[in-house]
Amino acid sequence: MSAVFAAALTACGGGGGSPGDTSESYTISLRAERTSLPLNVGHYPVGIGVEYPYTTTLYVNAKKGSAPIPGGEDIFACNTEYGLSSGPLYYLDGKDEHQKEGVPLAYRSVTLGSNSGGNSFHFHASDQAGTAKITCSVHDPRANRQVSTSINITVGGATGMAGSIK
């Protein structure tokens, strides 16, 4: 009887170990430290920290089920879908290709690698009131489709008054 039980247990794959490849789809999330920024009528520079109130950090993450997606280069694509006049995107990663003479370059879209399923980038308010919609996507290789999510960042909404209207 124990031989039959052992054979049945072996046949069904019992005994633990890896669950193997799962068929779970990718999910993506995008959040910002602040979704409302003041108008930058003084044209203050972009930066990270409390000394830079016109800049917010955005965090993009993707999971396959409950686990982070695999790492790699050029995994996330993030774009200013609309509202570019309210502010551009920045890497602020210190890489030479993302700055000119030590000054960070502004972008309408960024491409990011994945480390532990996520990465971060930045949005910097301009002197134009409005809402910027930022969309990020990741390719789900199992489903062979793009998975995306968006977030809105309001510039100039904190006071209710626009400092500059065109």
Each PLM stretch: what is its role?
Residues 37-54:
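Short, solvent-exposed loop/linker segments at the N-terminal edge
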Residues 50-58, 117, 128-134:
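Short, solvent-exposed loop/turn segments enriched in Ser/Thr/Gly
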Residues 64, 127, 138-142:
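Surface-exposed loop/turn motifs at beta-strand-loop junctions within extracellular Ig-like
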Residues 99, 106-129:
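Extracellular/luminal low-complexity segments enriched in Ser/Thr/Pro
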